[in-house]
């Protein structure tokens, strides 16, 4: 008797934004106290961002991940003890180690000895984590996975650099995946090119208990934009090819919410109408690895994304990394 094909299927989604919502004008007023000039008009025109959320000083990445995870688990209607794989995509972990995933496993009270680890691919992190969990489930090594993107990027922002500090925010998004004979994730593609590591990075490193060099995010905006618009269309087409789908069969595009100009450019290159693109960058800013699952949860909960529809996600981030997945919700 032939063995049936296993897929990983999205059972539920969840997200969380810290309550401190900071508008462009509020941020501009804060920066003005240090002699840094910016404005709502300047930020909106270049990025599409109108507001972002910042975590309180005593709130960690795992705290944000916990709420998003609880909401995803509730939506999926699964027993937390059945979750035998936890993957957290983050570039702002609570500690160098242990992993944020292990901390989250403990906070959720999961005691089954399942695997838990972090994935670090910056803004591509959720695409990397989702594809990794899908592979584990397809091979039968795990049956139920919790995949999270969570960030406290406000901790690594230089608020004297107006070209970067206005872009990013904090938040978390989560999905629960489960083994299924019904198709869920249909195709994924992941790539990296380390020769571009210097265009988006934190130059400092930990050396004998202190940070050697700058601990703040550095970005060559023009180089990132040029590379992003070049690779995002290609990786999306690659994932669609693996899924044996044409772009016109995509119901919803969820790009990494970095910059509205990059997002609309990719949508246009794929031949998709703009109304099929989920946009949250205006209210969330760039939440790095959290941006895709945050946008996914928003669109699921407001009723736009419905069961049976095809969803294409894609991300690009430091490393340089990029990736995409397409799934039937």
UniProtKB/Swiss-Prot annotation:
One GO MF term attached to the UniProt entry: beta-ketoacyl-acyl-carrier-protein synthase III activity
GO CC terms in record: cytoplasm
Pathway where this protein functions: Lipid metabolism; fatty acid biosynthesis
Enzyme class: transferase
A single GO BP: fatty acid biosynthetic process
Enzyme Commission number(s) from the entry: 2.3.1.180
Function in brief: Catalyzes the condensation reaction of fatty acid synthesis by the addition to an acyl acceptor of two carbons from malonyl-ACP. Catalyzes the first condensation reaction which initiates fatty acid synthesis and may therefore play a role in governing the total rate of fatty acid production. Possesses both acetoacetyl-ACP synthase and acetyl transacylase activities. Its substrate specificity determines the biosynthesis of branched-chain and/or straight-chain of fatty acids.
Family, as annotated: Belongs to the thiolase-like superfamily. FabH family.
Domain notes: The last Arg residue of the ACP-binding site is essential for the weak association between ACP/AcpP and FabH.
Subunit composition and interactions: Homodimer.
Protein name, UniProt field: Beta-ketoacyl-[acyl-carrier-protein] synthase III
Organism: Burkholderia pseudomallei (strain 1106a)
Lineage of source species: Bacteria, Pseudomonadati, Pseudomonadota, Betaproteobacteria, Burkholderiales
């Amino acid at each position: 008797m032939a063995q049936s094909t296993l897929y990983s299927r999205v059972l539920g989604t969840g997200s969380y934004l810290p309550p401190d919502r900071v508008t462009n004008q509020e941020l501009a007023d804060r920066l003005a106290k240090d002699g840094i000039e910016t404005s709502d008009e300047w930020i909106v025109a270049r990025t599409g961002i109108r507001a972002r959320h910042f975590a309180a000083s005593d709130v960690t990445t795992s705290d944000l991940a916990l709420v998003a995870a609880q909401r995803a688990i509730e939506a999926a209607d699964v027993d937390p003890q059945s979750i035998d794989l936890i993957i957290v995509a983050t570039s702002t972990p609570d500690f160098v180690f242990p992993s944020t995933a292990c901390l989250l496993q403990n906070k959720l009270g999961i005691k089954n000895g399942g695997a838990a680890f972090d994935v670090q691919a910056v803004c591509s992190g959720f695409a990397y984590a989702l594809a990794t969990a899908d592979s584990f489930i397809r091979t039968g090594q795990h049956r139920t996975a919790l995949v999270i993107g969570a960030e406290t990027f406000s901790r690594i922002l230089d608020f004297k650099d107006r070209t970067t500090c206005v872009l990013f925010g904090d938040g978390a998004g989560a999905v629960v995946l489960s083994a299924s004979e019904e198709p869920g994730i249909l195709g994924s593609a992941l790539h990296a090119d380390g020769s571009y590591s210097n265009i988006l990075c934190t130059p400092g490193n930990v050396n004998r208990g202190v940070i050697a060099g700058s601990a703040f995010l550095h970005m060559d905006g023009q180089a990132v934009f040029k590379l992003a618009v070049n690779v995002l269309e290609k990786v999306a087409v690659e994932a669609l090819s693996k899924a044996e789908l044409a772009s016109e069969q995509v119901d919803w595009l969820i790009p990494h919410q970095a910059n509205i100009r990059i997002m609309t450019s990719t949508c246009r290159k794929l031949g998709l109408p703009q109304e099929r693109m989920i946009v949250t960058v205006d209210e969330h800013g760039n939440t790095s690895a959290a941006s895709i699952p945050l946008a996914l949860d928003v669109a699921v909960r407001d009723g736009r994304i419905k069961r049976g529809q095809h969803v294409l996600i894609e991300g690009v981030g430091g490393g340089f990394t990029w990736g995409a997945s397409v799934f039937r919700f």
